[in-house]
Amino acid sequence: YEVYVDSAGSSSGQFSVGWSESSRSITDDNSSGDTEGWITYAINGNYYSNGGNGSYGATYTTGDVIGCKIDTNSSTNNIEFYKNGASQGTKSQAFNTGGTGFISPYILLYGTRNGTARFAYNEWTQTPSGITSSNAINTTNLFGA
């Protein structure tokens, strides 16, 4: 999926996009040490996860498009984030889905920041490398739209 940064807002607030276990509450913040598996790429260029945080990629701002890609076929769930089509690198993230296998998009916004998420392949402005119309999620079948 991708998120268009509609407004980067002021210096206070949060804008992070990524993945989490479906059991994670949407009211949780980006606190390291949580028991649910999650990882995000934040507006300040850092990554945050339940396993820690650190330097990751470029900062982003209003008008940028952030792409989020996950390879669940790998044993470590390889996750890659993109800024305007350019890969920011690959991270590995363990998820404890309790056998459900549900990993969900995770978008954290507060303050004066907002964005627009696009889940349909034909709506993306930037297509991550390795993704084609034949291997992208078919949102028509997924959501019945």
PLM feature segments, named:
Residues E2-A145:
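PRY/SPRY (B30.2) beta-sandwich protein-interaction domains
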